[in-house]
């Protein structure tokens, strides 16, 4: 499955803005779904404190990170989560198909994911054996067994 979905099969992959930076730096994909299931408290897990803790952990652990911001609301992320004066970043190109963005996300070295499958798939598709994945300790606000976590992930209590 991973070989079938390599980004290299899509022409848009090679011209994706910031791809070279993402491939050659300590890139960290931060996948934030701002409008995540609006009206459903079951998925209301990742607070502002979660994102702040996740970013702080990455900046302590990864030297000179380049954040690749993937979100349904990039402006919100830049205004509230990533200090654009302090960190280098690249933003998701909304003019290319989402499957190309997913392939580019998987090129990142490390990942901060929320409780969405989009970020989960990006880290899963990553070929970096030394990747750091930061995730919320719960996937849903209700107690329900979820088998999505890897043993080596850094979980932040939510």
Predicted feature descriptions by range:
Residues 1-62:
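Secretory-pathway luminal glycosyltransferase catalytic domains
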Residues 6, 11-15, 68, 119, ...:
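Compositionally biased, low-structure terminal segments
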Residues 29, 89, 133, 153-155:
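Conserved beta-strand scaffold positions in the cores of enzyme catalytic domains, especially
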Residues 32-34, 138, 158:
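Active-site donor-binding loop signature of nucleotide-sugar glycosyltransferases
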Residues 42, 81, 145-147:
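Short aromatic-enriched loop/helix-cap "lid" or pocket-rim segments at secondary-structure transitions
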Residues 52-54, 95-98, 152-153:
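Short amphipathic alpha-helical segments, especially helix-boundary/capping motifs
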Residues 61-143:
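Donor-binding and catalytic core of enzymes assembling or modifying cell-surface/extracellular glycoconjugates
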Residues 141-158:
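Leloir-type glycosyltransferase catalytic cores
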